[in-house]
């Protein structure tokens, strides 16, 4: 039988579902992130994008956790505004409206924690984004658990980011509303404060999460967790999110072809 990382990587490309045997389940977060990294290596080149999840009470409840989690987005699953995004029907698909923040300077590994002020200075742009989440595991997101979901790419299916807004620092992201539409009807709304109180707090968490390993590099973009909750979607759906002065983003879902 193929290793768990090989099976998870294959499932992202084939639409299959994976059963994790008891003897290969990650026993802690460190083991889960190790599997996640192996999956990324198998899939190949990563994008310059990160996703952070479980930044809202709803998302944490769904995964059975009390803290965020992160994953780098593989290049083949990173999209831009207006994209046709291929998805598999068995992967328990949901969409979230999220603020994406871009880093303007390197934030290298170091012993001292990064402060909120340092991160605020380092961010050089904000963009609307849609993250599509799901599970390659039998039972879906709700039954996967934190460790298994982390191993499975942090539940990421695809990330779609919009136009970067550079002149944004006079905007309070915590009170900025996001309206999520499914097939031209608003189905969910929320404020930036759903993401750890403020999307900037999410970026601070990620910088400190990565300061003992890779750090963050200038030009990388980070989706900061759902402001709209999770909305069930499937192939054929049209999705749009309106972030007010920050802009809009849209995507439509199509049936994936097995790779």
Indicate residue ranges for each PLM-predicted region.
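Catalytic-core "active-site belt" of small-molecule-metabolizing enzymes
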Residues: 2-198, 213, 234, 238, ...
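A conserved acidic, glycine/proline-rich C-terminal tail/linker
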Residues: 202-231
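Low-complexity, intrinsically disordered Gly/Pro/Thr-rich segments
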Residues: 226-227, 233-241
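Beta-strand-rich extracellular modules
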Residues: 244-246
